[in-house]
Amino acid sequence: MTGKFITFEGIDGAGKSTHLAWFAQQLEARLAPQGRKVVVTREPGGTPLGERLREVLLHERMHLETEALLMFASRREHIAEVIQPALERGDWVISDRFTDATFAYQGGGRGLAIERLEALEQWVQQGLQPTRTLLFDLAPEVAAARLADARTPDKFEAESAQFFVRTRAEYLRRAAAEPGRFVVIDAARARDDIRKDLEKLLASL
């Protein structure tokens, strides 16, 4: 039996990583009686090579196209070494970001042509798409307030407010274009209210 692939998306500060950890725990409890596992991973990263590329991508300045190509290089390794093998075993994969983040950040935020990203997506993913994508939607000014003084920001977190306005807009455009895959979650609400939504989603999967 093939597993399912769930991705968590949203701009920095939307709280997706916190909710991902809780969601994964709940899913593990549901799948354990079936002898199935939950693989929790992230992008950029997810493999030894991917984690090294993550450090480069998050902290070094580079040409726009170089950044996108490194994102997809890391993703190809991630798919081949982690995601595809897990799905073929019947396990479930939960990833903190996937290709939608590249469209949102490099496409929406940085302005790279969407057509170029689509070509890379087809080549690298070979048809692989998430079963469900949970988009934690939050106004950029609220997200920025949450991140303030939290830690030393990486190069993306340090981007301008307008960068995140464009990034959020591209996320929402993609969600509107694929309503069967995306679940948009209002991340401005209280944690318990968001978890109720996640519980409903778990029951439907």
Swiss-Prot record:
GO CC terms: cytosol
Alphabetized InterPro entries for the sequence: P-loop_NTPase, Thymidylate_kin-like_dom, Thymidylate_kinase
KW Nucleotide-binding (keyword) present: yes
Signal peptide (residue range): none
Catalysis performed (reactions): dTMP + ATP = dTDP + ADP
UniProt cross-references to SUPFAM superfamilies, sorted A to Z: P-loop containing nucleoside triphosphate hydrolases
Key words, A-Z: ATP-binding, Kinase, Nucleotide biosynthesis, Nucleotide-binding, Transferase
Its job: Phosphorylation of dTMP to form dTDP in both de novo and salvage pathways of dTTP synthesis.
Similarity comment: family membership: Belongs to the thymidylate kinase family.
Name this protein carries in UniProt: Thymidylate kinase
